[in-house]
């Protein structure tokens, strides 16, 4: 298990570093970085399909699509949802929205709990219910003080929840399904990358070509590291370690100069308390399981 924990934490650190890495790719815009990231990351995802013996699962999806043609719309929807999230992740640090997106990732486990309860009738423990209530208080305070949550935080928390729920409903929540979803993004990403005048960009950032290759390399290594970790760890441990990424994102947000305004502090405190409650419950369950 130690190996899995180290791999999961390494993946979170790499994903957190990607949040910062996009600031090194200026003057490229969010769409440009998004296009290049998918182009350079997809080969790693395809390699993972072969490495983890998911080739047959990919073929089975094509059989399902042939039998159920409407399933292709599910893949297209999920592909679009995933693409929006990846774009937002890369766009935010260069546009003053790094903290807002980080808040969205902190809210995500709470919205996932609500989706699990409302859509899949999953049980909610008292601790998780308390965490949701505290987060709701933070959200309500933000509505009173600022008129509502930022669109970035809402897009992350509810967008990703919808994405994961749709994958579960359609039974495409595996590596093979992820590979097909990312592959469907390729035409759009090629278009975005094709529009970039790399010669002009190189005049402003002479290392841009090397940085773009590193973008794909870091993304691919982070993704495959996470996949390996997920195969070594129980799902509850993996979920608990998943909090490392939003913490890294918060750190990056402060590192690049973003600051909390006074109206947002109550939301921040409530989300941190909720996160601590989630993590505490997870640790208690792990202790009981391996006692």
Curated annotation (Swiss-Prot):
Membrane-traversing stretches: 5-23, 33-52, 69-91, 101-120, 127-144, 148-165, 172-194, 209-228, 235-257, 262-284
Pfam families with a match to the protein in the record: EamA (PF00892)
Keyword DNA-binding found: no
Topology term for the membrane: Multi-pass membrane protein
Predominant location: membrane
Transport as UniProt keyword: yes
Keywords linked to the UniProt accession: Cell membrane, Membrane, Transmembrane, Transmembrane helix, Transport
One CC-aspect GO term: plasma membrane
Compartment(s): Cell membrane
NCBIfam families documented for this protein: rarD (TIGR00688)
Family per similarity comment: Belongs to the EamA transporter family.
Protein name: Uncharacterized transporter PM1281
Organism: Pasteurella multocida (strain Pm70)
């Amino acid at each position: 298990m130690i190996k899995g924990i180290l791999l999961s934490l390494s993946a979170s650190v790499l994903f957190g570093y990607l949040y910062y890495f996009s600031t090194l790719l200026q003057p490229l815009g969010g769409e440009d970085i998004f296009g290049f990231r998918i182009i350079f990351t997809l080969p790693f995802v395809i390699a993972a399909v072969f490495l983890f013996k998911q080739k047959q699962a990919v073929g089975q999806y094509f059989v399902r699509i042939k039998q159920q043609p409407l399933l292709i719309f599910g893949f297209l929807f999920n592909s679009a949802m995933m693409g929006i999230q990846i774009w937002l992740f890369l766009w935010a640090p260069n546009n003053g929205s790094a903290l807002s997106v980080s808040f969205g990732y902190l809210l995500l486990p709470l919205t996932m709990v609500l989706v699990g309860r409302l859509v899949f009738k999953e049980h909610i423990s008292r601790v998780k219910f308390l965490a949701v209530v505290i987060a709701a208080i933070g959200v309500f305070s933000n509505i009173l003080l600022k008129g509502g949550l930022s669109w970035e935080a809402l897009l992350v928390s509810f967008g990703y929840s919808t994405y994961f729920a749709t994958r579960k409903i359609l039974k495409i929540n595996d590596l093979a399904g992820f590979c097909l979803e990312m592959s469907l993004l390729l035409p759009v990403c090629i278009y975005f990358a094709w529009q970039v005048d790399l010669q002009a960009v190189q005049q402003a950032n002479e290392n841009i070509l090397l940085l773009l290759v590193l973008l794909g390399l870091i993304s691919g290594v982070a993704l495959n590291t996470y996949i390996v970790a997920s195969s070594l760890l129980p799902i509850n441990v993996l979920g608990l370690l998943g909090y490392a990424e939003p913490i890294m994102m918060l750190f990056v947000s402060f590192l690049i100069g973003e600051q909390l305004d006074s109206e947002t502090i109550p939301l921040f405190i409530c989300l941190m308390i909720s996160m601590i409650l989630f993590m505490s419950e997870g640790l208690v369950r792990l202790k009981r399981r391996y006692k």
